[in-house]
Amino acid sequence: MLLSDRDITAELDAGRVALDPYDPGMLQPASIDVRIDRFFRLFDNHKYPYIDPAEDQPELTRLIEAKQGDPFILHPGEFVLGSTFEMVTLPDDVAARLEGKSSLGRLGLLTHSTAGFIDPGFSGHVTLELSNVATLPIKLWPGMKIGQLCFFRLSSPAEKPYGSGEYASRYQGQRGPTASRSYLNFQHTDVTVTDAGQSGE
C-alpha cells in the first residue's frame, strides 16, 4: 500500500521512518522530495581495461566534492554516482522507492539507472545513479531537489529486514555515494544445464 502524505507524516512523527534532515516543506501528496548532496563519485576510465562485477576494483571510481556555491557539471553521456542529502531510515514493515522528478527528466537527467528500491530496515544515504541523456551539460546544484521517495507498507513485517545478520547488507549505514560492492557476494549459475538436467548442446 502506497502511503499518503498523512500516513508519511504519522510515520515520521512516530519515529518509525526518519529523514535527517527533514524539511516539512518537502512533503508531497504521496511522497517526500529529497535533495542532492555535494559529493560525487566519478569513474576513472584509465585504471582498468574493463568493469567486472566479480572483481574488487577499488580504483574504478574516485570521490570529489563540489566547491561551495558551485554546481557539478554532468556532461552528455556521462554517468556518475551521487547521493541524497538526507539520511533515510526505514522500519521493518515499510519499503521505499526513489523516483526522479518530472521537471528534471524533461531536461534529460536520469536520477537512477536501476536501483530505485529501498529495503525495509535500510538506514543510510541513498546512492543516486545519475546519467545525462541530453545533448548539453546539466548543472547539478548541491541542495537542489533531485528526486522523491515513495513509501510502501508491507503486508507484514519483514522476517529478515535489511541490516539483519542474515544478509550481507553491503550498503547499510552508507555515507555519500558508495561504489559498487557486487564482488562481495557475486554469484553466477551454470547456464549450460537444461531444465531436464542435461548439458546443453
From Swiss-Prot:
The keyword Hydrolase applies. The active site is at 129 (proton donor/acceptor). The keyword Iron does not apply. The record marks 116-117 as: Important for bifunctional activity. Pfam families: DCD. HAMAP family: dCTP_deaminase. Belongs to the dCTP deaminase family. This is dCTP deaminase, dUMP-forming. It comes from Clavibacter sepedonicus (Clavibacter michiganensis subsp. sepedonicus). The gene is dcd.
